[in-house]
């Protein structure tokens, strides 16, 4: 059997996936753009560094020309330092006519970035620039200028700081925009998931998904709501059918009274309650007199009308807490619970018998009369089980029917108190006419 795979919580949520995707795309885009701008800037700086270095060398050659002519090393060094110190130069050397160094200048190593500047100059700048020193058109010496990587390092550090700042700003912007986008996408999906979870767990088919701001998600919500409409309708029909089947299984189709199975179950629960609370209850077994004669002489339709009227008249003499059921044929049973005394059961039985004095009107306009014979069994005096109570009430009904139809009789019990109550009620009740 295929088992449905359940979500374990180890997979990332859609919200997190979208956040990661948006942030990753933004960071990659900014990093790529920053790297491209940095490379272009470095190439541009290098393109301008070589001509600038040549201009510096030419300017130095003009400045130290007189000092080289007169061989004044001190003047050459002063002129050299004056120009080189203010330019992007790491070192400058003036050579005389014989190629011997006449004056030199080297930028002092200051700060921990000096080595990095030298390395950048070695990687990115061209070889030292050499410029001849001319006097009256004759070469009297030369100047060698070596560029510095300070500008390159400052550019790289500034570019790196700018890139980091852009990355931070981009991350914040991407997070803000992603939240808005995710709210529009994940929000409706979360609502749909919550509704689906509620429907699955609580069977609440009245839940609906609210409208989303995105067309596709809105269409999905409408389709899901339409599915819920169908499920709600199907669930309602199923509940109605189940209720109807349950009613049919426990009720008589003709009189709509509970059947024997329902009565016995209710009687069992009533006995447990009576035992726990030390209360009394009574079971009345009722049989219709002359019903077979009416059914054979007037037909089944007349017999059905008689049964329906009997059920209505019995129900009319009972309390809301009492129960009347049709056991089958023309036999009925009544459960009286709770019961103050056995005398109350006898009085209710007399009321039921008296309710049958009025004739029953049939569908053709004619009338027919019938009577009821009732047997009564009490708990706990006569029996303490459903079967025993029904049996005792049934036996009492048959004895009463043999003695006089349209009467009632209490089950046999050698209890003087119960017998005395029955005698007192019998003496106060007019004798029923023979049937």
UniProtKB/Swiss-Prot annotation:
PTM per Swiss-Prot/TrEMBL: Phosphorylated at both Tyr residues and Ser/Thr residues. Dephosphorylated and inactivated by TpbA.
Activity regulation info: Activity is tightly controlled by YfiR, a small periplasmic protein, and the OmpA/Pal-like outer-membrane lipoprotein YfiB. Diguanylate cyclase activity is inhibited by the specific interaction of YfiR with the TpbB periplasmic domain and is activated by YfiB, which releases the YfiR-mediated repression through sequestration of YfiR to the outer membrane. Activity is also controlled by dephosphorylation of the periplasmic domain by the tyrosine phosphatase TpbA.
GO molecular function (one): transferase activity
Pathway of action: Purine metabolism; 3',5'-cyclic di-GMP biosynthesis
Cytoplasmic topology ranges: 1-22, 176-435
Transmembrane segments: 23-43, 155-175
The record's free-text note on cofactor binding: Binds 1 Mg(2+) ion per monomer.
GO cellular component term of the entry, any: plasma membrane
Membrane topology, as annotated: Multi-pass membrane protein
Signal peptide: none
Function description: Catalyzes the synthesis of cyclic-di-GMP (c-di-GMP) via the condensation of 2 GTP molecules. Important for the regulation of biofilm maintenance when exposed to peroxide.
Protein's UniProt name: Diguanylate cyclase TpbB
